[in-house]
Each structure stands twice: as structure tokens, then as C-alpha cells.
Amino acid sequence: MHTRAIYPGTFDPITNGHADLIERAAKLFKHVIIGIAANPSKQPRFTLEERVELVNRVTAHLDNVEVVGFSGLLVDFAKEQRASVLVRGLRAVSDFEYEFQLANMNRRLSPDLESVFLTPAEENSFISSTLVKEVALHGGDVSQFVHPEVASALTAKLNLAKA
């Protein structure tokens, strides 16, 4: 069993699809680090600190999960965290090409870092942070796609933006 795995992402916000993959990764690996990327090029709705806090709340019941914000190259972060595995989610065939390129680049930069792909449960296969934000922005109910604390935080964030 590989001891330490990283599940990286922007998590803006964390969805039920992300949470499902985190729970399954926590069963597969001794220690899972949720690496939350600063990623300013994506112009996240939530700050890095807010995203770390939300992911901490959603994963609080998992003893072997740690949430850490980072910036810079993922392979450097993985090395700092002494992780040997990257966990990535594949929702659809359309995700595969990008993830395949990413896995090969990461392997070239850090040959000892292995990528493992997990697919979401069917009920989560269409959920993305972008879609959740879009639904919420137009007043739709996102409670079936995100943890209740995330739904509340998203509503509060959008109400502040409208004010």
C-alpha cells in the first residue's frame, strides 16, 4: 500500500463528486493529502483560505485526510509532502485526454510519482464546481450537489457579490 497520496484540485467549491473521491481514496491509502491549488489563473470565487476551510469541514470525519493549500508545481508539492501517488478523478471520456497529458508531464518531472485515476459514482459524474457555481448564481438549489456547509457558504458569497 502506498502510504501517502495527494488529491489535488482547485475545489472552488468542493462538490459531492470531490467528496466521494476523497472518501474512496481514504480507503485506499494510509494518508491522503487534499492539495488545494491557489491557481489564480482560474479566478476562484472563494479565497484559498476559504477553500481550505470548506474542504476541512466536509472531510472532518476522515481521520487519515489532511487539507493543505499550495502554490507552484504539483510535483514539488508532492515531494514536500513525501507523497508517491497522485489521485485524479475522471468524470467522462472528455477528461481523459487532459488527465493523460498531465500524468505524463508529472511522470517526466517526477518519475517516482504515480497517477491513479478514480471515476465518480454515477450520481456525481456530471457535477463540476463550475456548474454548481452557475446554478447557484442563477438562484438554483445546489443542495443535492454539495455539502450543506458549502451550499450555505456559496449562497453567502453570491449574496455579498450582488450587494
From Swiss-Prot:
ATP binds at T10, F11, H18, G89, L90, R91, E99, N124, S125, F126, I127, S128, S129, T130. Transmembrane segments: none annotated. SUPFAM superfamilies: Nucleotidylyl transferase. InterPro entries: Cyt_trans-like (IPR004821), PPAT (IPR001980), Rossmann-like_a/b/a_fold (IPR014729). Substrate binds at T10, K42, L74, R88. It catalyses: (R)-4'-phosphopantetheine + ATP + H(+) = 3'-dephospho-CoA + diphosphate. Keywords: ATP-binding, Coenzyme A biosynthesis, Cytoplasm, Magnesium, Nucleotide-binding, Nucleotidyltransferase, Transferase. One of its GO terms (biological process) is coenzyme A biosynthetic process. Its cofactor is Mg(2+). The record marks H18 as: Transition state stabilizer. The keyword Flavoprotein does not apply. The keyword Cell inner membrane does not apply. Pathway: Cofactor biosynthesis; coenzyme A biosynthesis; CoA from (R)-pantothenate: step 4/5. One of its GO terms (molecular function) is ATP binding. It comes from the Bacteria. Its EC number is 2.7.7.3. One of its GO terms (cellular component) is cytoplasm. Homohexamer. Reversibly transfers an adenylyl group from ATP to 4'-phosphopantetheine, yielding dephospho-CoA (dPCoA) and pyrophosphate. NCBIfam families: coaD_prev_kdtB, cyt_tran_rel. This is Phosphopantetheine adenylyltransferase. The lineage of its organism: Bacteria, Pseudomonadati, Pseudomonadota, Gammaproteobacteria, Alteromonadales. The gene is coaD.
